[in-house]
């Protein structure tokens, strides 16, 4: 304090208190300002004692001078204070701060001999010679530059700043001041001084790495440089990691192309510091709002504290102060602030708002409210006889207009007080039409229905109310059970408040008052002195006139004028009128009027007003993915023509409210460009939203496919309309708009680019389809409920309406839909409105009784590319839905393999023939028909050449649609398997389009199908069907028998191949002593096995037994293929067709064929009989009791598979049907599938562990959510379960099951019924469980007991699959293995990041480092190179590996201790 007290003494201190802070202000300097300035000097490494003299102040000003233009408010205040102290020391008389600054400027300018002003905006990085100031780089007299290290005072000031402010807003300008002119070496020295705050330092490092990478990408390395030439800096050079101080100085001050590496590096650090400031000060300036009762001064303090953390230009901060400070104030203060006029000073705002919210203001408000309440209400139309009182819109006072007002002009709208529009365009001044009573906060956004009195307020009594708009909402109310009328809530959904509530009770939720649309006259029925009259509600008429009624002789003659001229009327007063369930007494005239009208005198008495509800669709909140930021991509160059086109498009969109100008604080940008539309006359604007799509949250497509005309029910009338600018009618959430910013550049950079952001859904953004689909579903939902007899098909912006109504009624419902859409802000362009057939819709042409494809045009090319073929195939696939016989197999083969889109394609003869055949098919026009629910749906399948299939789905003789199938999933296949795939495709397609399965006509005999299906059934969904007699086109070609053929020769085959030389051998031996070997070249193991099998077929008789050890060969043969892409398999097929009977079996790797010993000694029939005869009988008893499978018998009794298979096959209850073909399912250890099945009138709930096949099942009393939840809880208490997959039955989707799953931590997923990829495992297990129950049913009385017995058999008596284990063994083994893996990983992770230095024997030198494998109590195990050593703990030093930067001794390990400087 001594130095601070000695700064100014006596007379100087008195003079200080006479100097004003501002020229026009009243506040003056005090000694507290000197104390504050002394504290601030320490941040810049300057001594407080410098303030005691004129020369010291001059030194301070020299340091602060270059920082003023970009400094904070604190820095500028410090500079001003030092200027005042300098003037006092120089005995210069000044009145205020501004005079002091000007005086200091003149004196210091004269001393330095320059005209440089004090607060200069820019200065060179290195000063001229002789003016070194505080710069680390200084110029010598010879013109060279030398480096002066940073002083300890500067580093200390930096560290103290970080410690005091904890990365507050002051850190960034402080860093700018202290690092002025520094090299990267000096900046790194400053960063290294910060010991704590390592999280912030890591953020800065990541920013440096990112910026360095961007620098390297934008500045590629040039070619070889001449000798002696200085290289250009890389990103790591700028960061100071790969460059020296001398190189940095040369880059900064070289004459040719200098690179300011210091300033660049400072900018990188500033970006990192700004990110840290935002992290440590998370409050956004936009979120700082004044509380309802918060004093204005406290709000201003919070505002400016947050404003300091915003690192933006001074102009932007000034804009924030002028707009946000007032905009975010509470309503009371905002009202006061707007009365201060344009751009009030902060002092004026603080003074004006000083008493706002206090008792005084509340008393004034209450007095005004009481005064208004005591004022009698005006008599209707009495004001028309008096002079109207003029009220000023600007100041609110009476007696003058806004033009004559002398008060400061209010900023923004004079109606609502908001900026951005004038009062004439204020949305709050808009009105809806004829609303009964006063409005709430939100106007109803949809047309209303009939009034509560029963009269249709929207139509004349003679017209049917069934077609009125009110029907939409009447039906919606009945569906929801509501009693009131539908209104639009703020969140965009529809609610139905109770009709019984009064207007005053509804408050801000809006009123369900009578509403009249303007597409026809608002005519109602009124009762005038009990006489019913139809009258027109006319807000443009002053008086009310009716004709044709008698109201007595007490009248006054009157002549009134109107559009048709003057008419004579009789004016009668005090007439009772009942209209819209309200009674009033008013004056009415009778006379010869062309139409009865109620004018404003009656409408006012009824409380009606003219309103225009502004339809608002609430935007859906959208966010970025966690941890992601918006796109910051530069705009690429565009041609002048495209720039002008984009400017015109953007100006039009801005006028229509679809775009708005982006503020200067928006840091995001996405490139934009333009392309010509199809007509080549207009341009289309495109935005490259790929980066924004990558960081935006994920969405779910609500509409998963395109509607098909064959699925439409047959209707008499069809209308198609289009929603114009569909995406641009849906608002984008305000918080997300900033990320859609884009820039329109100018030619030659003649002006700054104009930046826009989207206010609506942008084209090309991934969220637009999902949000649009969701919004349209909500908008159309009440219309669908109100018109259940009308078909409404909506796909994106195309809408189809079909009905059996009369022409007038159909047109009326279409008009209602258009009005509904128009009322919500959607446009329905007349040019795309289609009423008369043919109607163009989704690529189809529609008539009331049939549909066609729009005209197809196959491309004609001289030279075909891959892209051309793709387009051609796409057109043909589109045509295949109605043109039968379309083929594309050979066309697709033209582009098979890896080819570029522009690569030229060479046509084959087959492809040319296929194309010509398709052209002939397309030349004959085809028609499709609509679906009739009462008729049966049929599907007929036909096989074409080359395994291409055609099918048609029809009702009687009328074809709904056709299709083709040519996808061959296996290299070796047969017609029956392909037929099953075709049936499956048709079944899925029919479920999607019609919701039902057709009756199939299959070109196969029942016996052929059942023979293949019994031996090759699949765990996939195949719909049920009835066989219809058709010409059999599909048949199996060779006879595989299930049992060995007695008396036939038995062949044992094998093949092998050397992987390096690709040489192999195929061989066989027989039980009769024959053998054969064939040497193969350039082959594989699988090909050698097939060659051996083919040799066997060639050399064997008409009946043969073949034993193979290859599952590959076995799988091909038992699939009974009819054709294949493999030469050797086609040869096998041809040879097997010639055989009378073939028995094929598989045994695992009989080594005798491999050359070790003769195969006939290993697998001869005699050995099999002698070795296992005594074990066959116990195996048969075991099977009769438990019905164990073949693998279990083989494992438990050691009998051969052939014997075990025979035991199972001879059992009447266990007829084998082959092995299942399993698809790919999630087989993690915690995944279970659950389903309910029915047997003997009981409900059985089944749960299957997917990976092991372990089953849990029991009988439950009812298929409810509670019983399912109890079973799930019981299951989870026994076994680990993390994922449960079920179908979407009501019991599985119930709240009880969801609550149990949430409590246990189970992830739930649901599949679609009949989908083969959904719950195939549990569906198959239901089948197995029922079969097992049928085998042992007689062993128990109740179904509850037999279910548990069957579960025991399936879990413990059924062996096979992976590891040849039972499901119970497999599940326990999986759980044990998982625990062991976790234990080992946990142990290994303890040693993963440690290295060991060690000593061996008497050698005192430390060796290593080695990798730590294990740490025991007395020794450690170390891996050194390929050797593993055991080292005593006392001779080992364990060190954590920190990537070569830091080391920790073993004291950081648990149980470590130090002895004599060594780690034990």
Swiss-Prot record:
Keyword Nuclease carried by entry: yes
Active site: 538 (for protease activity)
Positions bound to Mg(2+) 3: 1235, 1287, 1323
UniProt cofactor(s): Mg(2+)
Site (Cis/trans isomerization of proline peptide bond): 223-224
Site (Cleavage): 135-136, 366-367, 383-384, 432-433, 446-447, 513-514, 612-613, 1051-1052, 1171-1172
InterPro entries xref list: Aspartic_peptidase_AS (IPR001969), DNA/RNA_pol_sf (IPR043502), Gag_p24_C (IPR045345), Integrase-like_N (IPR017856), Integrase_C_dom_sf_retrovir (IPR036862), Integrase_C_retrovir (IPR001037), Integrase_cat-core (IPR001584), Integrase_Zn-bd_dom_N (IPR003308)
Chain segments carrying region Interaction with Gp41: 7-31
SMART domains: ZnF_C2HC
Protein name, UniProt field: Gag-Pol polyprotein
Segments of skewed composition (Basic and acidic residues): 477-492
Start and end residues of each RNase H type-1 domain: 1045-1168
Gene3D superfamilies in UniProt: 1.10.10.200, 1.10.1200.30, 3.30.70.270, Acid Proteases (2.40.70.10), HIV Type 1 Reverse Transcriptase, subunit A, domain 1 (3.10.10.10), Human Immunodeficiency Virus Type 1 Capsid Protein (1.10.375.10), Immunodeficiency lentiviruses, gag gene matrix protein p17 (1.10.150.90), Integrase, C-terminal domain superfamily, retroviral (2.30.30.10)
Region (RT 'primer grip'): 839-847
N-myristoyl glycine lipid attachment residues: 2
Region (Interaction with human PPIA/CYPA and NUP153): 192-229
Keyword Signal: no
Low complexity bias (residue ranges): 459-468
Short motif Tryptophan repeat motif, span: 1009-1025
């Amino acid at each position: 304090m001594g130095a601070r007290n000695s700064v100014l003494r006596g007379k100087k201190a008195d003079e200080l208190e006479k100097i004003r802070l501002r020229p026009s202000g009243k506040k003056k300097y005090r000694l507290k300002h000197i104390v504050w300035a002394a504290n601030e000097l320490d941040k810049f490494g300057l001594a407080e004692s410098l303030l005691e003299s004129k020369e010291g102040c001059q030194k301070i000003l020299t340091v602060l001078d270059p920082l003023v233009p970009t400094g904070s408010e604190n820095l500028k205040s410090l500079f001003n204070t030092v200027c005042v102290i300098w003037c006092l020391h120089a005995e210069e008389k000044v009145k205020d701060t501004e005079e002091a600054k000007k005086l200091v400027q003149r004196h210091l300018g004269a001393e330095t001999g320059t005209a440089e002003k004090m607060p200069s905006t820019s200065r060179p990085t290195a000063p001229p010679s002789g003016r070194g100031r505080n710069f680390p780089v200084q110029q010598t007299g010879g013109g060279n530059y030398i480096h002066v290290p940073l002083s300890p005072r500067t580093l200390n000031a930096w560290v103290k700043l970080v410690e005091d402010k904890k990365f507050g807003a002051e850190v960034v300008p402080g860093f700018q001041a202290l690092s002025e002119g520094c090299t990267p070496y000096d900046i790194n020295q400053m960063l290294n001084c910060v010991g704590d705050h390592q999280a912030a330092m890591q953020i800065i490092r990541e920013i440096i790495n990112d910026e360095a990478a961007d620098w390297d990408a934008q500045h590629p390395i040039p070619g070889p440089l001449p000798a002696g030439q200085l290289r250009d800096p890389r990103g790591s050079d700028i960061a100071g990691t790969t460059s020296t101080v001398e190189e940095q100085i040369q880059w900064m001050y070289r004459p040719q192309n200098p690179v300011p590496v210091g300033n660049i590096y400072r900018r990188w650090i500033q970006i990192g510091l700004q990110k840290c400031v935002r992290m440590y000060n998370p409050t956004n300036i936009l979120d700082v709002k004044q509380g309802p009762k918060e004093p204005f001064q406290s709000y201003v303090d919070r505002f400016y504290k947050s404003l300091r953390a915003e690192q933006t230009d001074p102009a932007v901060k000034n804009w924030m102060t002028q707009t946000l400070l007032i905009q975010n104030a509470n309503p009371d203060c905002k009202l006061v602030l707007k009365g201060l006029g344009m751009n009030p000073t902060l002092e004026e705002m603080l003074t004006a708002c000083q008493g706002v919210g206090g008792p005084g203001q509340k008393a004034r408000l209450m007095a005004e409210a009481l005064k208004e309440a005591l004022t009698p209400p005006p008599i209707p139309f009495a004001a028309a006889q008096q002079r109207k009182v003029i009220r000023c819109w600007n100041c609110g006072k009476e007696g003058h207009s806004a033009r004559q007002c002398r008060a400061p002009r209010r900023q923004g709208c004079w109606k609502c007080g908001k900026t951005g529009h004038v009062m004439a365009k204020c949305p709050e001044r808009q009105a809806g039409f004829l609303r009964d009573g006063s409005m709430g906060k939100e106007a109803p956004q949809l047309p209303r229905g009939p009034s509560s009195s029963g009269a249709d307020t929207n139509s004349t009594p003679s017209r049917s109310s069934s077609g009125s708009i009110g029907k939409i909402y009447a039906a919606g109310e009945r569906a929801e059970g509501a009693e009131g009328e539908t209104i639009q809530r703020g969140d965009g959904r529809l609610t139905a408040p109770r009709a019984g509530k009064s207007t005053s009770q509804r408050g801000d939720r809006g009123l369900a008052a009578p509403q009249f649309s303007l597409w026809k006259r608002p005519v109602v029925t009124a009762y005038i002195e009990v006489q019913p009259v139809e009258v027109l509600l006319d807000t443009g008429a002053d008086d009310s006139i009716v004709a044709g009624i008698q109201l007595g002789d007490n009248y006054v003659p009157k002549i009134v004028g109107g559009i048709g001229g003057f008419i004579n009327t009789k004016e009668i007063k005090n007439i009772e009128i009942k209209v819209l369930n309200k009674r009033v007494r008013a004056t009415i005239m009778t006379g010869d009027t062309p139409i009865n009208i109620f004018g404003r005198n009656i409408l006012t008495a009824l409380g009606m007003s003219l309103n225009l509800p502004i339809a608002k669709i609430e935007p859906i909140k959208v966010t970025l993915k966690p941890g992601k930021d918006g796109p910051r991509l530069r705009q690429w160059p565009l041609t002048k023509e495209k720039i002008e086109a984009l400017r015109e498009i953007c100006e039009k969109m801005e006028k229509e409210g679809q775009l708005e100008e982006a503020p200067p604080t928006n840091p995001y940008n996405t490139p934009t460009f333009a392309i010509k539309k199809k007509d080549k006359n207009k341009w289309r604007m495109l935005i490259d939203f790929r980066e924004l799509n990558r960081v935006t949250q994920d969405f779910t497509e609500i509409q998963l496919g395109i509607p098909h005309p064959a699925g439409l029910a047959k209707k008499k009338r069809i209308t198609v309309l289009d929603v114009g600018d569909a995406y641009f009618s849906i608002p984008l959430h305000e918080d997300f708009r900033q990320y859609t910013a884009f820039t329109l550049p100018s030619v030659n950079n003649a002006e700054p680019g104009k930046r826009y952001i989207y206010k609506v859904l942008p084209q090309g953004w991934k969220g637009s389809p999902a949000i649009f689909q969701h919004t349209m579903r909500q908008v159309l939902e009440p219309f669908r409920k109100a018109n259940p007899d009308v078909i409404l098909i909506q796909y994106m912006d195309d809408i189809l309406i079909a009905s059996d109504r009369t022409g007038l009624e159909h047109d009326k419902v279409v008009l209602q839909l258009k009005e509904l859409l128009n009322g919500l802000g959607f446009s329905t362009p007349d040019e795309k409105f289609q009423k008369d057939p043919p109607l163009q819709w989704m690529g189809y042409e529609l008539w009331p009784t049939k549909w066609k494809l729009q005209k197809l045009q196959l491309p004609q090319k001289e030279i075909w590319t891959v892209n051309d073929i793709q387009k051609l195939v796409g057109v043909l696939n589109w045509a295949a839905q109605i043109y039968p016989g379309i083929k594309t197999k050979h066309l697709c083969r033209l582009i098979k393999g890896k080819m570029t889109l522009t690569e030229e394609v060479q046509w084959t003869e087959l492809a040319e023939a296929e194309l010509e055949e398709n052209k002939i098919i397309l030349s004959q026009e085809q028609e499709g028909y609509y679906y009739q629910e009462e008729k049966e749906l049929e599907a007929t399948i036909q096989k074409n050449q080359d395994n291409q299939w055609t099918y048609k789905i029809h009702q009687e003789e009328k074809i709904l649609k056709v299709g083709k199938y040519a996808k061959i999933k296996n290299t070796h296949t047969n017609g029956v398997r392909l037929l099953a795939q075709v049936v499956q495709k048709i079944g899925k397609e029919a479920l999607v389009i019609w919701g039902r399965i057709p009756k199939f006509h299959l070109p196969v005999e029942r016996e052929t199908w059942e023979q293949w299906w019994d031996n090759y059934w699949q765990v996939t969904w195949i719909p049920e069907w009835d066989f219809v007699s058709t010409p059999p086109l599909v048949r199996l070609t060779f006879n595989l028998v299930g049992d060995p053929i007695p008396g036939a020769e038995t062949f044992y085959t094998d093949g092998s191949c050397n992987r390096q030389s690709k040489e192999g051998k195929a061989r066989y031996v027989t039980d009769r002593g024959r053998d054969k070997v064939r040497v193969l070249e350039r082959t594989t193991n699988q090909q050698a096995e097939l060659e051996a099998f083919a040799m066997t077929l060639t050399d064997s008789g008409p009946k043969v037994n073949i034993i193979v050890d290859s599952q590959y060969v076995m799988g091909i043969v038992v699939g009974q293929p009819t054709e294949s892409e493999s030469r050797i398999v086609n040869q096998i097929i041809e040879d097997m067709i010639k055989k009378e009977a073939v028995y094929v079996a598989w045994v695992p790797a009989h080594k005798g064929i491999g050359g070790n010993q003769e195969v006939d000694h290993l697998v001869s029939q005699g050995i099999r009989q002698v070795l296992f005869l005594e074990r066959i009988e116990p195996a048969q008893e075991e099977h009769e009791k438990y019905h164990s499978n073949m693998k279990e018998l083989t494992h438990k009794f050691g009998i051969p598979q052939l014997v075990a298979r025979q035991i199972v096959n001879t059992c009447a209850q266990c007829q084998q049907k082959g092995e299942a073909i399993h698809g790919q399912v999630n087989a993690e250890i915690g995944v279970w599938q659950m389903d309910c099945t029915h047997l003997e009138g009981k409900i059985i709930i089944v749960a299957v562990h997917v990976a092991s096949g372990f089953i849990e099942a029991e009988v439950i009393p009812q298929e409810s959510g509670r019983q399912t939840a109890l079973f799930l809880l019981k299951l989870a208490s026994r076994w680990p379960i993390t994922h449960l997959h079920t179908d979407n039955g009501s019991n599985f989707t119930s709240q009880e099951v969801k609550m149990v799953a949430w409590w246990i931590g189970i992830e739930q997923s649901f599949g679609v019924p009949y989908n083969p990829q959904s719950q195939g495992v549990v569906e198959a297990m239901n089948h197995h469980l029922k079969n097992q129950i049928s085998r042992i049913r007689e062993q128990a009385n109740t179904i509850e007991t037999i279910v548990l017995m069957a579960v025991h058999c399936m879990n413990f008596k059924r062996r096979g699959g992976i590891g040849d284990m039972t499901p119970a063994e497999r599940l326990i083994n999986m759980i044990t293995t998982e625990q062991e893996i976790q234990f080992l990983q946990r142990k290994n992770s303890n040693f993963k990041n440690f290295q060991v230095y060690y000593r061996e024997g008497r050698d005192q030198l430390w060796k290593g480092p080695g990798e730590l494998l294990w740490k025991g109590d007395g020794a450690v195990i170390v891996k050194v190179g390929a050797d593993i050593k055991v080292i005593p703990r006392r001779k080992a030093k364990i060190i954590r590996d920190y990537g070569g930067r830091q080391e920790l001794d073993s004291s950081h390990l648990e149980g470590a201790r130090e002895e004599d400087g060594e780690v034990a």
